[in-house]
Amino acid sequence: FYRQDYDLALDNLKIVVDKGSPAQAEEANYWQAICKWKKGNAQTGIDELNQLLDESNSKDIRSKCFLSLAEIAGELKDYDTALSYLEEGAKLTKERAQKGVIYGRLAEMAFNKENYDLARDAYENVIANSLSKEKIENAHLQILKILRIEKKYRSASRKIKGMLTDDKFNRIAGNLELELVQLYKVQGETSEIETRLESIVSDYPRTLVSAEAYYLLGKVYTSEKWDLNKAKEFFDQVSKESSKSLFSPMAKTRSKAIDTYLNAEKDLEQHFSIANIDTLAVNPSDSDTSTAGISVIVPNRTVPELYYQLADLEAFNFNRMDKGIEFLNKIISENPNSPFHPKSMFTLAFIYENSGDSIKADSARNLLLETYPNSEYASYISSGVQVELKE
């Protein structure tokens, strides 16, 4: 079986069924069903496992059948059925360690399927049965996430504060602090967030916890505080704290976005300086110093292109939709001859649509269709409308 020679395994299992004891025959029947599934006959395997469930009184055999049926259902992407089978299999399993493993699988699958009641119950069983300290700690953290998702903030806060005072949970104290930050965030207690994160990076340096805290600090400074230089410092610190952090690649992406944003702002200022110099040259006043001899490098990108880049970053990197819309409207109102004029209309419609403002989205689309009926953007919108109508 483990060498995947299922035909030979089936031949040997048939001998066990014919000549073995009733208990051995039942075990062999189970493995026959598994072999047939592994050979590609999933339905045959399902039928034989269900038949064995009907006939057997052995809790061990029945547990194995339920667990294998759960695995087959998962393979067939029938996750609700898989959850049901896992639950039944876990209840019948006698061995505590195995019970903990099964409930762990059940909890993870239920959580991913957003069946939070089942997931929480399963994680409680992981805590009760698992022999792994790490799995027990993770189960506690997952229960806290579920409480937050279900908006049971007071229960979550009480659980966190209780665990923080218990030496048994010292290993995950930093994770508990981070979960407390998430509670502050969802409850709008922004004043507490930065203080708590600064405490975390100080108390748990060079860890996955401090890496995540630096990432969250960077997000604070690209949203509420809007200080991109400070945010970049925090994002750049993430990989220094832990190169293994899941937040490291995201932090690098955000840091690059900040560089792009600051460079675009710098080029815009250069354009404005050139325009100001040109104005002074045409309309000098007695108080003006001479502009002769001043050498100014003209940026490669135009003002509309720079506005568009800023709009793109504001809306899609920093989630500041209003600022993104503001830059797009500047292009639309001030730069009608730019190639970024139709592109800005299209992007504006996209942002409004994603924000759920269908009236403004329709208005932006209609303006684009009227102004640039032969553009690729108009063609895309028209084809999209036709597909929607056909559906």
Predicted regions: what they are:
Residues F1-E391:
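Acidic, polar-rich low-complexity tracts and alpha-helical solenoid repeat scaffolds
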